[in-house]
A protein has these predicted regions:
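N-terminal catalytic cores of peptidoglycan-degrading enzymes
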Residues: 1-84
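Short connector loops/turns at beta-strand edges and beta->alpha or beta->beta junctions
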Residues: 32, 92-97
C-alpha cells in the first residue's frame, strides 16, 4: 500500500481544522463511476466541492494507492452525523462506466483489499480493535446507529456486483491483516548446530551443559538450538548450581 498525502488545503473542512481523537473508522464508497482516487483528491481541494461542505480523510483505489486528503487527527465531514467527531472516514473508489462486469469486479476487489490494508494500519496506529463493536462501521451501519446520514454504502456496491463482501467480513479481514503483520514483524531467531557457531557469551555455558550430559543434540550430532533456548538452559543450570552450593 502506498499513501500519498494530498491534503485538501482549500477545503472548508481542512481550513476549519477541528481536532479528532480517532475512536473508529468509517468505510464509504464514492457512489459514482470513477476508479481514480487522484481525481477525487483534486476535486475535494476546493472550498465546497460541488457546493457542499464535505471532506473525507482518504480515497482508496484498486492498485493499493491511497490519497490522504485530511490529517488523520483532523475532524472530517464525511458522514453527516456525530461519527464525524469520532471516526476517520475512508472512501473506496468505484468502477468506471466503461468497464466490463469482470473488470468492475476486479476493481472492487482491489479497492476492498486496499481498504483492508489501510484500516489495519490505522487500527494499529491508534490502538483500535477492529472486532470491538462500533470501531469499524460502514456508512449504512452508521445510519442505523443514528450517527450518520441515510446512505447504503458500501455494502450496496458489493451486493450489486455479487461480491460476497460484508462489513462483518471486512472487520474479520482487517483483524487478520493485523495479525499477519504482527507475525511478519517477528524475525526468525537463528539456530545453532555447534558451540563454535554460537555467540561468544554462550559458548562456555553451553559447553558445560554438553560436558554434563544435559545437552546432547540430535541423531546427527547437531545441537539445533536457538538463542532463547540457550539463555533458558544456561539460566536453569545456574539455578541448579546455586542450589547445590547452598
Amino acid at each position: 500500500m502506498k499513501i500519498i498525502e494530498a491534503f485538501a488545503v482549500k477545503n472548508k473542512c481542512y481550513q476549519a481544522g477541528a481536532p479528532l481523537t480517532p475512536r473508529g473508522i468509517m468505510l464509504h464508497s464514492v457512489g459514482c463511476a470513477q476508479p481514480s482516487a487522484a481525481v477525487f483528491a483534486r476535486s475535494f481541494n476546493q472550498y465546497q466541492p460541488g457546493g457542499v461542505s464535505v471532506c473525507v480523510h482518504a480515497f482508496a483505489q484498486a492498485d493499493g494507492t491511497v490519497y490522504q486528503t485530511l490529517p488523520w487527527e483532523m475532524r472530517g465531514w464525511h458522514c453527516g452525523g456525530s461519527a464525524n467527531s469520532t471516526h476517520i472516514g475512508v472512501e473506496m473508489t468505484e468502477p468506471s462506466a466503461g468497464m466490463t462486469y469482470a473488470e468492475a469486479a476486479e476493481q472492487i476487489a482491489g479497492t476492498y483489499h486496499t481498504a483492508v490494508e489501510l484500516f489495519a494500519e490505522l487500527c494499529k496506529q491508534y490502538e483500535l480493535d477492529p472486532a470491538q463493536d462500533g470501531v469499524i462501521i460502514g456508512h449504512a451501519e452508521g445510519h442505523r446507529r443514528g450517527v450518520a446520514s441515510n446512505h447504503a454504502d458500501p455494502e450496496l456496491l458489493w451486493r450489486t456486483y455479487d461480491m460476497g463482501y460484508t462489513m462483518n467480513g471486512f472487520r474479520r479481514d482487517v483483524a487478520e491483516a493485523m495479525a499477519k503483520e504482527d507475525r511478519e514483524e517477528v524475525p526468525d531467531m537463528p539456530r545453532y548446530d555447534s558451540v563454535a557457531e554460537m555467540p561468544q557469551w554462550a559458548r562456555a555455558g553451553v559447553q558445560r551443559l554438553i560436558d554434563r550430559g544435559a545437552l546432547q543434540g540430535n541423531t546427527d550430532g547437531k545441537l539445533d538450538v536457538s538463542e532463547d533456548m540457550i539463555r533458558t538452559m544456561i539460566v536453569c543450570q545456574r539455578m541448579v548450581d546455586e542450589q547445590k552450593e547452598t
